[in-house]
Amino acid sequence: GLGDVYKRQAHGYMFPDDAMLDVRIFAFYEVPKSASKKKKAAMLAQDIRPTKKPDFDNIGKIICDSLNLVAYHDDSAVVDAQVRKFYSEQPRVEVVIKQIQKG
């Protein structure tokens, strides 16, 4: 799952307990096979973006919950977040986590 992928890519790094985190989630959906060539091109050019489920808030919850006790101790450390949905020929989810510096 996502936790295992994170552990491999981050070499097991866990953010400190007092960290304030910024999480950016990029969800790439498969282009529907029924899409015309013109529509597919518009989807891949980001002129058309996914408006189907899951909703952005559910994506954020699923991703952040799955990183509890893996990337951070609790997702309450996330103080800023963004979820963006796109189409791609390689469906996937990319997650970027940054620690916000104090002061």
Residue ranges and their predicted role:
Residues 33, 37-40, 52-53, 61, ...:
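Context-gated lysine
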Residues 9-15, 68, 81-84:
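Intrinsically disordered, low-complexity boundary segments flanking structured domains
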Residues 47-78, 82:
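Short, hydrophobic/π-rich interface segment
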Residues 76-103:
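C-terminal edge-of-domain segments
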Residues 30-32, 69, 88:
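Short Gly/Pro-enriched loop/turn and capping motifs at secondary-structure junctions
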